[in-house]
Amino acid sequence: MPEIYGPQPLKPLNTVMRHGFEEQYQSDQLLQSLANDFIFYFDDKRHKTNGNPIPEEDKQRDVNRYYQPITDWKIMKDRQKTVSAALLLCLNLGVDPPDVMKTHPCARVEAWVDPLNFQDSKKAIEQIGKNLQAQYETLSLRTRYKQSLDPCVEDVKRFCNSLRRTSKEDRILFHYNGHGVPKPTKSGEIWVFNRGYTQYIPVSLYDLQTWLGAPCIFVYDCNSAENILINFQKFVQKRIKDDEEGNHDVAAPSPTSAYQDCFQLASCTSDELLLMSPELPADLFSCCLTCPIEISIRIFLMQSPLKDSKYKIFFENSTSNQPFGDSKNSFKSKIPNVNIPGMLSDRRTPLGELNWIFTAITDTIAWTSLPRPLFKKLFRHDLMIAALFRNFLLAKRIMPWYNCHPVSDPELPDSITTHPMWKSWDLAMDEVLTKIVIDLKNAPPATALESQMILQQQETLQNGGSSKSNAQDTKAGSIQTQSRFAVANLSTMSLVNNPALQSRKSISLQSSQQQLQQQQQQQQQFTGFFEQNLTAFELWLKYASNVRHPPEQLPIVLQVLLSQVHRIRALVLLSRFLDLGPWAVYLSLSIGIFPYVLKLLQSPAPELKPILVFIWARIMSIDYKNTQSELIKEKGYMYFVTVLVPDWGVNGMSATNGSAMINSGNPLTMTASQNINGPSSRYYERQQGNRTSNLGHNNLPFYHSNDTTDEQKAMAVFVLASFVRNFPLGQKNCFSLELVNKLCFYIDNSEIPLLRQWCVILLGLLFADNPLNRFVCMNTGAVEILLKSLKDPVPEVRTASIFALKHFISGFQDAEVILRLQQEFEEQYQQLHSQLQHLQNQSHLQQQQSQQQQQHLEQQQMKIEKQIRHCQVMQNQLEVIDLRKLKRQEIGNLISILPLINDGSSLVRKELVVYFSHIVSRYSNFFIVVVFNDLLEEIKLLEKSDINTRNTSDKYSVSQGSIFYTVWKSLLILAEDPFLENKELSKQVIDYILLELSAHKELGGPFAVMEKFLLKRSSKAHQTGKFGFNSSQVQFVKSSLRSFSPNERVDNNAFKKEQQQHDPKISHPMRTSLAKLFQSLGFSESNSDSDTQSSNTSMKSHTSKKGPSGLYLLNGNNNIYPTAETPRFRKHTEPLQLPLNSSFLDYSREYFQEPQMKKQEADEPGSVEYNARLWRRNRNETIIQETQGEKKLSIYGNWSKKLISLNNKSQPKLMKFAQFEDQLITADDRSTITVFDWEKGKTLSKFSNGTPFGTKVTDLKLINEDDSALLLTGSSDGVIKIYRDYQDVDTFKIVSAWRGLTDMLLTPRSTGLLTEWLQIRGSLLTTGDVKVIRVWDAHTETVEVDIPAKTSSLITSLTADQLAGNIFVAGFADGSLRVYDRRLDPRDSMIRRWRAGNDKQGVWINNVHLQRGGYRELVSGATNGVVELWDIRSEDPVESFVDQNVTSQYGSQQKPTTMTCMQVHEHAPIIATGTKQIKIWTTSGDLLNSFKNSHNNGVTSTLAATGIPKSLSYSSTSDAFLSSMAFHPHRMMIAATNSHDSIVNIYKCEDERIDYF
């Protein structure tokens, strides 16, 4: 037997897909994309930030430690230098001081010289002085060293005074060795000799300060050295106190403040004596400071547990060839005899590599142990200070083993002694010594390489003044004198070209055999230190970088940049580190990375370009001001120009620069001939292979390619834009026709929006404040390219175009600028011409020069000739500049920009307001006249009682029709922009014009009279109870904007008082009067958005200042609830000033501060956002699967079971169920949005849409429902707003807002704005009481197409195919339906027209809906109750039925009722109609359920304010019509509400069948 569902068997349901849409389900590609592709809209950064940069306050708070700014990272060029050094040696060899009892044997070696090897003590101390000076010269050769050997007091005074006179204000090094005199006194006095060396004479520390002046660095190598340090500080404090009391020491050569900039290094504390171990030097402290590698090796071997086994070979011959004395002494067997081959300055040798490693390790220890300011002060300001303190760290580690504890001022922490990096230093020494042991045991007695190294050492050691007898003494200690630049060339300040290094490097390149040997040595690594630390750094980047703590390997990575072997790998890792955010960039800059990457810009190696461009983009993104002047030097900016224009200056410059770089000898340069297929290149390829494919725009390519991607070009353009920003010298050097043409090419042809955006910005910056560059760009067509980019599909590019064209606005000083440029180019031409003549003369005189020199001269000439031609071209351009032509172009630009006031992106419109502010500022006098005439015309209209009877022959003002009048009207439109920030900015521009008008000499008086007249008229209208907005005002507003708010809402007393404290428009009396003036004209000074922005937490109601008392309740409660906050927007509180400052450039450069090499947080597996998104996706799939079985239930179930009733507090006009959240969203006629949780029965949020009085919300849609949904509202004034986090009133924000329709007609029968959102295509269909259906593209935020409706009837309903998005259907007030296909030409897009409602007159379409799922039924419902199902392939309905129109009994008459609403379930074959009952139908026309939506709750709450008695209220509403209904998209649920009722009832279909078996 057939199954019975109702009172009779149901008609068969449709089982065929309608409209031929079955083809969509047969497309595997489409179904796969629907299942896997989740495209989210209005989710870009501009929607979350409103196009504003992060406020400085947030950066200072830095809650997430993302910035950690270090603003003083740059090492200034005028930093202090140690220019002179005093080496004061008080040894008195052969005589021990009386206060110290020395052991026997005891330490006696000074500066690696044993005095017992000399018969004459004078020669011994001279040799000690020479050696000590040579050791210091390894730290800094540029310092002038002077020795004072066993001096008397007079010599010391004369010596110190002379040094201060020659040093002026620079630093002096004072090294004091007091091994031959008593230890310093408790008061800090040091001892010297009298002239006869018969007495020890104390020298007051205060006198020493006076003689030496300041600043100084003091090294005390003596017993109880801390006594000097402590008393030095006391004397400095005494000088400061004396200065404060007015007793300045006039004998002091330096200001007292300079003494605070002194540094001190002392060998031991005040109660300690220096070590006396005979196996160690007596001046162990000085050895640690001046030759750390040698002393480290010796002490490492002496303390090694392997000295009797592995390292025994170093102790076997310790009794022979030792620098100190008699071989019979037993302690000599404890002293190792080791000679590390190589040179300190040559990092390719074992000794050089050890020195290099030591520099990296000590830098790391200091950087991780010291506060950042102290680290910078000690290690990044002075070469000598950095070297001494770096080596002092070694002293702090070694000397405590021998009961000496070095101290310093400033004091360094004791944690340095046990820092973990010292183990790395021990490991590095062990690796080198192990290889030496292997070579000594296995290698022949003397290899060719060793012989060459020995020869190099001997050549370096040879001095004219050294005797043959002393060669043996200095052999083991000769490491210290092998290179005078050892430590200096490894410091971060040593990147200048060193002549000695250059000469040695040029000699080494003379023969091809030596070059081959050099390359072989270059690849050889004696330790794995750097490679291991790079691996450690890579692991830190992979696993620990999210903690945002400084990695200890960063200083080591800095040192690795000096190595050509590991340079590319180090740069890649460094770029990955910089990609972590601004905090990483600041850290890198503070450690000293900048000089290195600046020097690398001179490298011609093509494989470095992508990495360097990326690194420089990161640096410029956080601090471009401190880098601009540096890029001028050596034309570093040209590196980025050649990335964009690879063939720039090929004939003239590249050959010259290339040869210069190859021969420069700088350790940071990399020649193009380098083997790029070496291990580093292969490593990077492995890195590329392991990296995921979607890393962002800044992926680094394989470096064997010379080409750069558009993303990398965008970074180069950004660097140039930052270089020329507010930097005229940079603009002058960077501007060239080649660059301009290439930028235009990229704007026209690149598919990467980022490149187009920054090319547009750079073009604008290149001609900013420069009429010559503007004229050149105009003549070359660059301006036309910018105008074309105003229609770019990407909002950021459109905004950039407005930003660039803003700089084309002429300045007041253009004529003076042209005159100055003429003078500059004339001077430049004369200089270049003289240089060219000099080169030509030089070429004629030197006929016998080499071919290379001849080529070099020719290249120089070609370069200068090219510069001369460029100079002549610019001079010619200056002569033909036509300022009037520039003005015409400027007006043309303005005309082209004006249509953007209707752009869908608030970012574009905000920049447009800024552009208008520049126009107003430049032509303020014109705008004063325009506004005055406009107000005058308005007063004339107000004087006419009937606008229709006014004299039509009245002439319009001369300002009407001008471009400035159009801009004024545009500003009025933008003053009512739906986006709050744009609105406030526009008001500032309008206020500025009115303030200028009020202060005008001639028009200020008449304007004041006009103001009084309007205010008086407004007050009279208020007293008579007339609403202050008449037809003449409508006429005034109509030409600019139809939806100006007619009322001015003010706050209650408490809120008004708060506003007066914060709002300058209220606190300024002139601005207050101007506000009243606008109120008198019917303009609202602020609409609901701005009124409630600051009162969201209190939710205080706003009342109307204007309007009669009868409208008070209606007007006052219009926006009682809070409005959404605008991201990163704060109201203007500063004095009004034009032009407005654009934040777009700072906002855009934040892109290069954000991580680009890794996935976004939401796409990273395991992240909170990823897990939340995955959970939502699984939940959505679960809901869809669970509700599939409910389709059958919808046919036989009971729909009249009420699930819950929700009180909206006002009558809901619109309702919308969320697909997957348990949310029901309602909107009433006062634009109040309410979000309910229907499962829990509570209100989640309640807020105002912020629409002006007289308008209401007419549509609700949800966007991105597959994830975190956004709420879209459409209001009757054509405004569309999109909200994020709408379910939480504390965090919800407005994402975007714009006018979907600009010519809406507000009539009593108008349905307002109707929308249809197509998630699959990102399209928003908008229509209403207009003659078009406008299609907005969410990707581009522009109008995609306007499709004519082909009728003058009002559109009442709109629906579209949600799967493909090509077909949409509109229902009209004349009862017709029209089908459109957007794939066709707009003129031919209407493909079908139907007449619904049985073709009766006076019937209009309530609703038309195309199912999202099911069999895609297209259902229409008319007001006469006719429900029809359509197939777009058919001209007639495929099914039709009529709601029986339940009649109402009034006496003996029966009147038919009207079907007020109709809804279709998205997936089930169910239709609901609403009259005074809810009826549930099948799509075949069978009635399943019929029930009333009646209740007793909520009625009186709605009508109590009207004063209607409760009995009458109930009787009038118990039989009320349904106001609105809404099906749940998936569940079998329906929400319904009655007219004049605040209660929303939700019904759920339930299975009530009884199973008897």
UniProtKB/Swiss-Prot annotation:
WD repeats: from-to residues: 1207-1248, 1252-1293, 1296-1346, 1350-1390, 1400-1440, 1452-1492, 1517-1557
Compositional bias per record (Low complexity), positions renumbered to this chain: 1084-1098
Region (Disordered): 1084-1114
PROSITE patterns cross-referenced by the UniProt entry: WD_REPEATS_1 (PS00678), WD_REPEATS_2 (PS50082), WD_REPEATS_REGION (PS50294)
One of the GO biological process terms: TOR signaling
GO molecular function, one term: protein-macromolecule adaptor activity
Disulfide bonds: none
Localization (cell): Cell membrane; Vacuole membrane
Signal peptide: none
Keywords: Cell membrane, Membrane, Repeat, Vacuole, WD repeat
Predominant cellular place of this UniProt entry's protein: membrane
Per-repeat ranges for HEAT: 548-586, 588-625, 777-814, 888-925
The keyword Cell membrane appears for this protein: yes
InterPro entries: ARM-like (IPR011989), ARM-type_fold (IPR016024), HEAT (IPR000357), Raptor (IPR004083), Raptor_N (IPR029347), WD40/YVTN_repeat-like_dom_sf (IPR015943), WD40_repeat_dom_sf (IPR036322), WD40_rpt (IPR001680)
GO-annotated cellular components: cytoplasm; cytoplasmic stress granule; fungal-type vacuole membrane; mitochondrion; plasma membrane; TORC1 complex
Membrane topology: Peripheral membrane protein
Binding partners and assembly: The target of rapamycin complex 1 (TORC1) is composed of at least KOG1, LST8, TCO89 and either TOR1 (TORC1-A) or TOR2 (TORC1-B). Interacts with PIB2; following activation of PIB2 by glutamine or cysteine. TORC1 binds to and is inhibited by FKBP-rapamycin.
Alphabetical list of PANTHER family matching this protein: REGULATORY-ASSOCIATED PROTEIN OF MTOR
Family under the similarity heading: Belongs to the WD repeat RAPTOR family.
Functional summary from the UniProt entry: Component of TORC1, which regulates multiple cellular processes to control cell growth in response to environmental signals. Nutrient limitation and environmental stress signals cause inactivation of TORC1. Active TORC1 positively controls ribosome biogenesis via control of rRNA, ribosomal protein and tRNA gene expression, and rRNA processing. TORC1 positively controls protein biosynthesis by regulation of mRNA stability, translation initiation factor activity, and high-affinity amino acid permeases that serve to provide amino acids for use by the translation machinery.
Name assigned to this protein: Target of rapamycin complex 1 subunit KOG1
